[in-house]
């Protein structure tokens, strides 16, 4: 199944991809609206049941509505840095033996099609194409062998980073949380439609049509199951939490000269079977 969170005339809604290839859905003020993805996941409601209800709704043209982040308010945004060996090397870091974790805040999130904003404070706006794993079943001390059972689906993220602010201190939080820099979308694809852990899928990032990142999901140092198992040793995971699983080599920071995103650019992140996350770049007003 594929779900799209959207808004029309200021009212939020949810749509599902139909068997015919179109989209059908309901606005939250319509009779029978099953709830947002956050609500469905937090309540443990069946996405199959929600999909059946939405499929009986009205046709939705995703090009004519405003897409929202797949989840506008994830419970936790758990990001993994230095998770591709080539990226660690190009960034000047020794490959860590344990996942490098940091967090994002919901206030940084934007949707497919929304502009990534380059702040007035810095020109060092960098792209980072990444796979997102969405938690559908919570837990603590989750065994790696069962970790993927806790993933309801996958999406795409552009972890756009303000590099000079990222490295002002040993903690990366500031440079990873500027407003309107975390693009998340375009849709949620449920796990049953994809290979386990998205192994075998390719990630490609393009800036103005030119490929700047290209890697297989298999190239991760710590795969999705490992990330879930290790993080859940310390933190209870809840439905609606997301893992932003790391970016491959090719980032602008590592290029000579550096390649920063600027006003008027278009950045795309594509992952096989998940679609394309596309965002324009604009300067902060």
Q: What is the predicted role of each segment?
A:
Residues 6, 16-18, 90, 112, ...:
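Short beta-strand-to-turn element immediately C-terminal to the catalytic PLP-Schiff-base lysine
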Residues 8-10, 87, 93, 163-285:
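Catalytic-pocket segment enriched in acidic/His residues
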Residues 4, 67-69, 89-92, 116-125, ...:
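A generic local secondary-structure boundary/capping motif
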Residues 95-112, 127, 262-273:
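Structural signature of FAD isoalloxazine-binding scaffolds in flavoprotein oxidoreductases
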Residues 111-147, 152, 157-161:
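Non-heme Fe(II) oxygenase catalytic core, chiefly the N-lobe of the double-stranded beta-helix
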Residues 1-99, 268:
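N-terminal non-catalytic cap/leader segment that marks the start of a structured domain
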Residues 103-119, 139-140, 180-189, 248-252:
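Short catalytic-site patches enriched in acidic/histidine residues
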């Amino acid at each position: 199944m594929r779900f799209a969170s959207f808004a029309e005339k200021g009212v939020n809604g949810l749509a599902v991809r139909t068997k015919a290839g179109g989209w059908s859905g309901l606005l939250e003020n319509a009779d029978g609206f099953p709830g947002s993805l956050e609500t469905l996941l937090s309540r443990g409601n069946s996405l199959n049941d929600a999909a059946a209800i939405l499929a009986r709704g009205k046709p939705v043209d995703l090009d004519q509505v405003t897409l929202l982040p797949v989840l506008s308010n994830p419970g936790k945004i758990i990001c993994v840095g230095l998770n591709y060996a080539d990226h660690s090397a190009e960034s000047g870091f020794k490959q860590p033996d344990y996942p490098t974790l940091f967090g994002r805040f919901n206030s940084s999130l934007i949707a497919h099609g929304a502009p990534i904003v380059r702040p007035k404070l810095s020109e060092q706006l960098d792209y980072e194409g990444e796979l997102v794993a969405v938690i559908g079943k919570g837990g603590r001390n989750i065994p790696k062998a069962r970790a993927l059972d806790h993933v309801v689906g996958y999406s795409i993220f552009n972890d756009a980073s303000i590099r000079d602010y990222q490295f002002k201190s040993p903690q990366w939080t500031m440079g990873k949380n500027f407003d309107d820099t975390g693009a998340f979308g375009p849709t949620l694809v449920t796990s049953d439609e994809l290979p386990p852990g998205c192994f075998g899928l390719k990630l490609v990032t393009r800036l103005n049509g030119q490929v700047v990142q290209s890697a297989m999901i298999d190239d991760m140092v710590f795969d999705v199951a490992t990330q879930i198992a290790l993080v859940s040793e310390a933190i209870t995971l809840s439905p609606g939490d997301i893992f932003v699983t790391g970016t491959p080599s090719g980032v602008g920071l590592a290029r000579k000269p550096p390649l920063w995103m600027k006003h008027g650019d278009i950045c795309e992140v594509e992952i096989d079977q998940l679609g394309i996350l596309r965002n324009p770049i604009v300067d902060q007003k």
